[in-house]
């Protein structure tokens, strides 16, 4: 699934951490989902994600 589509399912106040699935390294942290630009989100496909009860979603992309 494209990251842009995935983010449309996430609430605005959710923190997001993007990780490169292949390199296994963090790309960037965002305090709020809407801080990720459309052009950046369009570049990635979601491999899988994890979520915690504190409002953080870690998304592994390629």
Q: What is each of the regions a protein language model found here?
A:
Residues 19-62:
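Detector for the mature cores of small, proteolytically processed
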Residues 1-23:
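N-terminal acidic leader/helix
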């Amino acid at each position: 699934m494209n990251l842009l589509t995935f983010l449309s399912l996430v609430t605005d106040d959710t923190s997001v951490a993007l990780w490169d699935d292949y390199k296994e390294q963090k790309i960037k942290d965002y305090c709020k989902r809407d801080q990720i630009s459309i052009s950046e989100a369009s570049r990635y496909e979601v491999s899988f994600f994890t979520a915690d009860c504190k409002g953080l979603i870690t998304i592994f992309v390629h």
